[in-house]
């Protein structure tokens, strides 16, 4: 897929901005706090209807405006698609070819992106919540049903947690209602888990191959899903639901005491190991960075496998930080197949091959010029 253009209105420090793109690499050059990261972020938001930097849409809207709009014409293998996302303080409006989508889950996936930013090291060394968010965002790009299940799971989870609090405070004694929530939550949990198991397995296959190449065969990367429940990938759906229901019963008293659901996808994690060593805890910064790069490059291949075409790649202030070997591997992965947007403070440290292929955009105080 290929972004033919990008138009922003009232997005962060861009009052208005309109660009056209040609060629495989788009290079955004500027000092810090000028808006180059905002430009890349807007593409991510257009694709996923949420930012990787903040959960608050209000921060994406210019301080003196009531709304922000992102538009782009995206070339897919089946033709051109016009995407438009409007952000307001009250919600989002998403359009595909001028038709408003009633649910964001029907919109997400029209454009697939992979973002690699300095904060993506949190995939390796951050908190479990950051890795859960990574899983949810990446599966959601290629599976609208996953987003639907996740949304429903979170709604039922909130209702169940409220009932557990009421039971703890003696405001309710309805164990029958708890059983109803258990049944609904178990069914949704199993649907999410089956998708997550499959995702981690496929991601590991690609990441292992890439990591082995980066390290010249010295290291083997493995990913392991850390499950808070007794559900396993080998179980049938019925077996998994029964296991989840039994697990809820087993921890019921503790959950009532704490007023919170203690097991399920919202408590899960995944671990990364290099040569059977926990890279999150014991890995060097170099090993953690290489593991993160391997996962990001694996995402590119996994999306291609799932949707039949390569995603757009967003490299936010990371390309110049990669040594020549890692830059070479990245370039070999993308070649002319992956449209890539790069933000950087300067061209020093970038391979000549990158500069040869790149269209350059100079960013200063929310204005972009110097396209060539």
UniProtKB/Swiss-Prot annotation:
Q: Which domain of life is it from?
A: Bacteria
Q: Which UniProt keywords apply?
A: ATP-binding, Cytoplasm, DNA damage, DNA repair, DNA replication, DNA-binding, Nucleotide-binding, SOS response
**One Gene Ontology term, aspect cellular component:** cytoplasm
Cell compartment(s), UniProt:
Cytoplasm
Picking any one GO biological process from the record gives:
double-strand break repair
Q: Where, by residue number, does ATP bind?
A: 30-37
Give the main localization category: cytoplasm
Q: CDD domains from the entry?
A: ABC_RecF
What HAMAP family does this protein's entry cite?
RecF
Can you tell me which family this protein belongs to? Belongs to the RecF family.
Protein role = The RecF protein is involved in DNA metabolism; it is required for DNA replication and normal SOS inducibility. RecF binds preferentially to single-stranded, linear DNA. It also seems to bind ATP.
Protein name from the UniProt record: DNA replication and repair protein RecF
Q: Which organism is it from?
A: Brevibacillus brevis (strain 47 / JCM 6285 / NBRC 100599)
The encoding gene: recF
């Amino acid at each position: 897929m290929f972004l033919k253009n990008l138009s922003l209105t009232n997005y962060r420090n861009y009052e208005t901005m309109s660009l056209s793109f040609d060629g495989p690499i788009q290079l955004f050059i500027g000092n810090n706090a000028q808006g180059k990261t905002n430009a890349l972020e807007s593409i991510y938001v257009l694709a996923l209807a949420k930012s990787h930097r903040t959960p608050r849409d209000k921060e994406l809207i210019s301080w003196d405006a009531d709304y922000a709009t992102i538009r782009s014409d995206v070339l897919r293998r089946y033709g051109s698609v016009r995407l438009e996302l409007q952000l307001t303080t009250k919600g989002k409006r998403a359009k595909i070819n001028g038709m408003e989508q009633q649910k964001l889950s029907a919109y997400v996936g029209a454009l697939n992106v992979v973002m690699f930013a300095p904060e993506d090291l949190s995939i390796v060394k951050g908190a479990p919540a950051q890795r859960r968010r990574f899983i949810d965002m990446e599966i959601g790009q290629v599976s609208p049903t996953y987003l639907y299940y996740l949304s429903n799971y979170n709604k039922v989870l909130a209702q169940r947690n409220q009932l557990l609090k009421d039971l703890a405070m003696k405001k309710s004694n309805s164990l029958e209602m708890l059983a109803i929530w258990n049944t609904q939550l178990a069914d949704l949990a199993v649907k999410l888990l089956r998708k997550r198991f499959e995702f981690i397995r496929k991601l590991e296959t690609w990441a292992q191959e890439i990591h082995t190449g980066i390290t010249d065969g010295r290291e083997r990367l493995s990913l392991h899903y850390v499950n808070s429940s007794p559900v396993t990938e080998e179980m049938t759906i019925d077996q998994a639901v029964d296991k989840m229901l039994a697990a809820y019963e087993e921890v019921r008293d503790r959950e009532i005491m704490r007023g919170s659901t203690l097991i399920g996808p919202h408590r899960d994690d995944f671990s990364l190991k290099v040569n059977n060593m926990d890279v999150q805890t014991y890995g060097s910064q170099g090993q953690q960075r290489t593991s993160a790069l391997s996962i990001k490059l694996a995402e590119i291949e996994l999306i291609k496998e799932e949707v039949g075409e390569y995603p757009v790649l967003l490299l936010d202030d990371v390309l110049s930080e990669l040594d020549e070997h890692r830059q070479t591997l990245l370039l070999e992965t993308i070649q002319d197949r992956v449209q890539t947007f790069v933000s950087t403070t300067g061209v020093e440290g970038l391979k000549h091959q990158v500069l040869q292929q790149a269209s350059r955009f100079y960013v200063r105080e929310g204005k972009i010029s110097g396209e060539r």
